[in-house]
Amino acid sequence: MKEQKLIHEGLITESLPNGMFRVRLDNEDLILGYVSGRIRRSFIRILPGDRVKIEVSRYDSTRGRIIYRLRNKDSND
């Protein structure tokens, strides 16, 4: 049976080496996020200030996988 994951939205606050990011969730938790393979393959750029959806395991709530970059309303991308 596949593990149930929690999906949160958050803001990238800091870019770390090797595709890792510091993410502040909407509930004010600060966690470590890494880029999913699909985003890596699609060459989607994630920068500090971007809003993202992040998938967090029930067993380790300090790390998560970034699964989607939300579009900003003020940019043209």
Swiss-Prot record:
InterPro entries: NA-bd_OB-fold, RNA-binding_domain_S1_IF1, S1_domain, TIF_IF1. One of its GO terms (cellular component) is chloroplast. It is found in: Plastid, Chloroplast. Keywords: Chloroplast, Initiation factor, Plastid, Protein biosynthesis, RNA-binding, rRNA-binding. One of its GO terms (molecular function) is ribosome binding. Gene3D superfamilies: Nucleic acid-binding proteins. CDD domains: S1_IF1. Residues 1-71 form the S1-like domain. Belongs to the IF-1 family. HAMAP family: IF_1 (MF_00075). Component of the 30S ribosomal translation pre-initiation complex which assembles on the 30S ribosome in the order IF-2 and IF-3, IF-1 and N-formylmethionyl-tRNA(fMet); mRNA recruitment can occur at any time during PIC assembly. One of the essential components for the initiation of protein synthesis. Stabilizes the binding of IF-2 and IF-3 on the 30S subunit to which N-formylmethionyl-tRNA(fMet) subsequently binds. Helps modulate mRNA selection, yielding the 30S pre-initiation complex (PIC). Upon addition of the 50S ribosomal subunit IF-1, IF-2 and IF-3 are released leaving the mature 70S translation initiation complex. This is Translation initiation factor IF-1, chloroplastic. The gene is infA.
